Amino acid sequence: RSGYIFVRRSVMFPFLESLDAPVTTQSCDQRVATTVPTQALQMMNSHFVNEQAGLMARTILHDHAGSPGAQIDKVYWRALSRPPDRAERKDCLQFLRMMADDHRQQLSGDNLSEDELASTIEARALEDLCHVAFNLNEFFFQQ
């Protein structure tokens, strides 16, 4: 979603290379539209995307902790520039509950206080939702 980014001709960003970035050492009057398998894999698994999902989740939690409905609204506004519809909201609430249950099981052996456990679970579930939002077709392709 970036129109311009500063790039040194001799140093390519590995993330952009996987998205079939142009060769910066040659001029090009026109680029052909391409889709390569690594694009989807980078968006699903890359460290960069996971970091961005975590940053977005922390930002949203700062203002909307304990309010899943408001969190879902904010995720949709930030990722897609629109509110979720009723079905999407329902699916997201179900997803947050499911992820919270998974994270609760994963953290069950840790020595966390109840408050720490609850906030960690909420943060991780919301991070998962942000990651999902980054992988929606609507995030990649404008209608």
Give residue ranges: language-model regions.
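An acidic, gly/pro-interrupted, aromatic-rich
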Residues: 1-75, 79, 83, 125-143
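A short secondary-structure junction motif
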Residues: 22, 47, 99-106
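Short, charged low-complexity intrinsically disordered segments located at boundaries
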Residues: 70-72, 104-107
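Extended, well-ordered alpha-helical scaffold/bundle regions in very large, multi-domain proteins
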Residues: 83, 87-89
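Surface-exposed patches in mature extracellular/periplasmic domains of secreted proteins
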Residues: 87, 108-109
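Amphipathic alpha-helical segments that form the core helices of the histone-fold
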Residues: 90-101
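Intrinsically disordered, low-complexity acidic Ser/Thr-rich regulatory segments
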Residues: 109-127
